[in-house]
Amino acid sequence: PKLKYSRDSYSSPQMIMTIQAPDEASFEEFVNKNKQVIVDFFTKAEMNRQINLLKKEYSSVIAAKVGSMFGCDLRIPAGFERYKQGKDFLWTSQDRPGSEVSLNFVVYSYPYTDKNTFTRDYFIHKRDSVMKLNIPGSLEGQYMATDSNYVNVKEFSVKGEYAFEARGLWYMENDMMGGPFVSHARVDRPNGRVVVVEAFVYAPKDKKRD
């Protein structure tokens, strides 16, 4: 079997992957062996598409706020204007009209001490403490927490610096709300801190993608 791809053959932006195999059995075997490569290919293509879109149109309000608070350049889709600010914490959200869907971005930071700062357990502990303080529910005793049974982490590097990704599920303590989240944490060595950017969704009736 052979795998090849082409860019912008019939439209733009567009990525096409073609797999050639002599028969169905060898095709199935090839896909099973290379499924992660295939998924990563389209995931990266979609990420690049979103990045190019955000270069043209983004929330200038949130970009300016993140820049002043954290010294970071963060661009999120236009339409995110309202926000809640705390100590080393910023939360912006957008509710979809006519639905229960709520899209959210959070940025927060905390001191970088050593490599243990990036362990799975430490991340969950730190996330829970930050969210409990800054994202309470509508009633007393309600606050956001992490479902520790469903947190997957991945280490990688950005421009030679250590970075950490966590994907999992959040829930509202003493409430029925919950949904998926994705967090990216990076070391900011000049300022001796870790900066976390997170997206989380509340969409009880809709399917969620990566």
Model-derived features: positions:
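Short, well-ordered beta-strand elements
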Residues: Q14-S26, F105-S109, G192-Y202
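Extracytoplasmic
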Residues: S12, G67-M69, R75-P77, E161, ...
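A short, polar/proline- and glycine-enriched secondary-structure boundary/capping micro-motif
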Residues: V101-N104, M177, D206-R209
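Surface-exposed amphipathic alpha-helical segments
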Residues: E28-N52, L74, F80, R193-D210
